[in-house]
Amino acid sequence: MTRTVKCRKYNEELPGLDRPPYPGAKGQDIFEHISQKAWKEWQDHQTMLINEKRLNMMNAEDRKFIQAEMDKFFAGEDYAQAEGYVPPSN
């Protein structure tokens, strides 16, 4: 049986992650409140940000930027986009 969570991003019950994606409290919070759907969308968006903004994940400032954008993404706030990117309309 698939584990479900009340997804923070979509505000509905959706299938949850199989395990926390990070160690510690942040990973546990994501595990308990973020759906597989929202996590996959974040991973795709994160990849686009890293590539388009040429971020280096070895750089502490770039990691802080990605962390802050992830928090905004899941909270439904305005978050950074790749310049010129227009999301597909559903």
From Swiss-Prot:
Keywords: Iron
Gene Ontology CC annotations of this record: cytosol
One GO-annotated biological process of the protein: cellular response to oxidative stress
GO MF entry, a single one: iron ion binding
Keyword GTP-binding: no
Keyword Iron attributed: yes
Any matching Pfam family: Iron_traffic
Recorded family membership: Belongs to the Fe(2+)-trafficking protein family.
Family matches, as HAMAP family: Fe_traffic_YggX (MF_00686)
General function of this protein: Could be a mediator in iron transactions between iron acquisition and iron-requiring processes, such as synthesis and/or repair of Fe-S clusters in biosynthetic enzymes.
The protein, known as: Probable Fe(2+)-trafficking protein
Native source organism of the sequence: Pseudomonas entomophila (strain L48)
